Amino acid sequence: MNEFPVVLVINCGSSSIKFSVLDVATCDVLMAGIADGMNTENAFLSINGDKPINLAHSNYEDALKAIAFELEKRDLTDSVALIGHRIAHGGELFTQSVIITDEIIDNIRRVSPLAPLHNYANLSGIDAARHLFPAVRQVAVFDTSFHQTLAPEAYLYGLPWEYFSSLGVRRYGFHGTSHRYVSRRAYELLDLDEKDSGLIVAHLGNGASICAVRNGQSVDTSMGMTPLEGLMMGTRSGDVDFGAMAWIAKETGQTLSDLERVVNKESGLLGISGLSSDLRVLEKAWHEGHERARLAIKTFVHRIARHIAGHAASLHRLDGIIFTGGIGENSVLIRQLVIEHLGVLGLTLDVEMNKQPNSHGERIISANPSQVICAVIPTNEEKMIALDAIHLGNVKAPVEFA
């Protein structure tokens, strides 16, 4: 056992590796960074926001070697007791985080056609990490596993049965690690009993989703088989009538691939505003009177409020609504507009508390009294992954979850 063990958390995306190093005893972040632009001449590694290091034409293993070298420079290599990997999609095979074995890798590969862009990158990260740290126990944490508690009526689509039975077409949901972390923290902040409570978690960022959590379990969520379904997002359309897309294809001659690009990359806040997918840009334009920016934000808010209210139907009661993610944590305007839309649920906003910056951390923003408590809880997916790794790796756990 290392005297000062740490957990290395790795998140391999389609062209990047985000990583952090957390102290096992406290889960404090000791080091964090990103290797971006994999397999291009512009690839780089940035540690703790410092000057980027050139990694031209590096693949995942090259980038992880560079990260390992930076660990060694900081005398952290021998302290790596566990490695936690974020895996985008676990399909129906993975209902919880697991110790990585050859069999687990084979099963991840089996479900990877459900998320080819991300899962194969995740597998590349696992292969590289196992090669570089052969003696270190590694854990896989799935973005979909928290939602495996959905009932069939919540995850099935109204399609012919064979698409589900033969192809696995169903709602899987995403942002599960974030929803799980935030709901756990909400029980403490709101003084709720995990075994008898109802929460709605709104993870709002460039990607966004809603999750209904009943008695500690996900019972409904807005994203579907892919992250496209549900809320309108930065560049994703969210819910859209398939008939409308078929009509567009007929009228314009666009292919399925063309339309898939449109709804994933050219829609959402960007599509309606014609300006940007960045909410900060749109909020500035809102205050300057830019009509399409205002319309994009109002549509974004309407969809969020509608999904929150709809997801409440999956709960036995509604104790709290929690905002998280880059937008949920930082946008005073979006929280205000969403809560104003949800007056039907008995929500009342504390305007001054809502204006508090995210540096204030976890905070209740609903007025007293309010039928439903509204709060902001910064997400921490890296910590959740580290906690799972610590638990499964049987390393001395932190004193408390917080």
Swiss-Prot record:
Keyword Metal-binding annotated: yes
A Pfam cross-reference name: Acetate_kinase
InterPro entries named among the record's database cross-references: Ac/propionate_kinase (IPR004372), Aliphatic_acid_kin_short-chain (IPR000890), Aliphatic_acid_kinase_CS (IPR023865), ATPase_NBD (IPR043129), Propionate_kinase (IPR024917)
Cofactor(s) the protein requires to work: Mg(2+)
Biological process per Gene Ontology, one example term: acetate metabolic process
E.C. numbers: 2.7.2.15
Gene Ontology molecular function: acetate kinase activity; ATP binding; metal ion binding; propionate kinase activity
UniProt keyword annotations, A-Z: ATP-binding, Kinase, Magnesium, Metal-binding, Nucleotide-binding, Transferase
Residues the record lists as binding substrate: R86
Keyword Ribonucleoprotein: no
Catalytic activities: propanoate + ATP = propanoyl phosphate + ADP
Binding site for Mg(2+): N11, E381
Gene3D superfamilies (alphabetical): 3.30.420.40
Pathway in which this enzyme or protein is active: Amino-acid degradation; L-threonine degradation via propanoate pathway; propanoate from L-threonine: step 4/4
Site (Transition state stabilizer): H175, R236
Entry GO terms, CC: cytosol
Subunit relationships: Homodimer.
Function: Catalyzes the conversion of propionyl phosphate and ADP to propionate and ATP. It can also use acetyl phosphate as phosphate group acceptor.
Family note: Belongs to the acetokinase family. TdcD subfamily.
Protein name: Propionate kinase
Origin species: Salmonella typhimurium (strain LT2 / SGSC1412 / ATCC 700720)
The organism's taxonomic lineage, starting at the top: Bacteria, Pseudomonadati, Pseudomonadota, Gammaproteobacteria, Enterobacterales
The encoding gene: tdcD
